Amino acid sequence: MRREPPSLLAMSAHYDLLIIGGGINGAGIARDATERGLSVCLVEKSDLASATSSSSTKLIHGGLRYLEHYEFRLVRESLIERERLLAIAPHIIWPLRFVLPHDKGLRPKWMLRLGLFLYDHLGGRKLLPATRTVDLRTAPHGAVLEDRLTSGFEYSDCWVEDSRLVVLNCLDAKERGADIRTRTECVALDRRKDVWVADLRAADGSMEQVLARNVVNAAGPWVDSVLSRALPAERHENLRLVKGSHLIFPRLYDHDRCYIFQNKDNRIVFAIPYERDFTLVGTTDVLFKGDPQGIDISAEESRYICDAVNEYLRTDVSPEQAVASYAGVRPLYEDKSASNSTVTRDYQFEIDMNGPPLLSIFGGKLTTYRKLAEHALEKLGFDGPSWTSTKPLPGGDFPATDFEKLLADYQKRYSWFPAEGMRRLLRAYGSRTEAILKGTQKPADLGQHFGGDLYERELQYLVDQEFALSAEDVLKRRSKLYLHLSAEEQARVADWFARREQAA
């Protein structure tokens, strides 16, 4: 890429650490590094969590199926992290119970029982209830299943608001001194004797040059592209891109249990209660080639998901019944596995020390992001005590078992605010909901009403604190209000951002 002459570039700060990529890995590293005394700059070419990190099945889980592939270390680490993350972010992470029906001809019951025994005991489970056997002929959540499914198991894992997990890590990093820049692309990286020189391009096209002693390449599906930019003389083909897609249906059943369905191809599909009125179903595992930006579910994937549901639920579904869908690409480390579903979900590092260090990250999962961040910083030589395992994320400074108590307190103090709306606010912001509602006594005090329980005060908070710059940032990532607001109501949010931009 042609370099701009120095006169056209604004020279900026000198950082200890430049992080390229605003997904969960980059966000977790930024948070951890700031408390270790490092000066940090994170750049993301779009919005935070705009790619893989907002396209997950939204689970903090041990990875039950990874036991089949003997990934015991990954499962153990994931189970330990599941408990830690639930403790530091109980507003956006909460327990779920999963029903695993036993289907004759697939995995035998003894194998499922053994796997779940290991799942209960590998990670020192404390906060979540244990596995139990269920008689699906009499259990309430067996009523929606096909008659052939008479027994199964019930076990625990956790839900997470995936994109909010990213945003809250970046918010905490910012409050500890990190420079978080969205809509900013690193378009060139030059290695000098003891420093990296990075050219950054903002959304308005303006260029800035920053210096960094270390660079972390956490660009997810674009990690090889960044490597090629930084080390153009070398060949970089470390990724296997695997596409995962989901469908969102109107509620398929009327209880709070999730289901894990085994398929004849040895894959699994989850059905999870979602956003009060919906059921989230996925995911797929499809080899992907091409540009990972802005991908959609394919007709074949939609049919695959529906077929999986129809094998287990009494009520058949079709792709046409879905109210929404989303797809993302998992940037997995290419380990030459024969199947996309058996490629390791563990993370791998590649570090180049021929001059100032460049650390590239491959793979990883939401559940292990915090541990990945610690390992990444240790790999770069930044040792220090582990602090992120106990320090709550913004809004998460209350016991994991006390969410309903917190909700009752807020409903008492702000009794005029709708009950479901209050639950949504507390599930998003936790104790920081106070920053939105403080000083208000009636809806009019919250400013313009956009529909549902969304008011201007919340939008302003998201702009001021959580890096939101567009309606999509708010409606699809910092919340899932796009599922609840009409097209007209969503247009009002877009108009608010447009007016704000014009006034700037």
What are these regions (language model features)?
Residues 34-55:
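Glycine-rich FAD pyrophosphate-binding loop
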Residues 58-142:
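Dinucleotide-binding Rossmann-like beta1-alpha1 core, especially the glycine-rich loop
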Residues 156, 162-164, 172, 231, ...:
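C-terminal catalytic lobe of FAD-dependent flavoproteins
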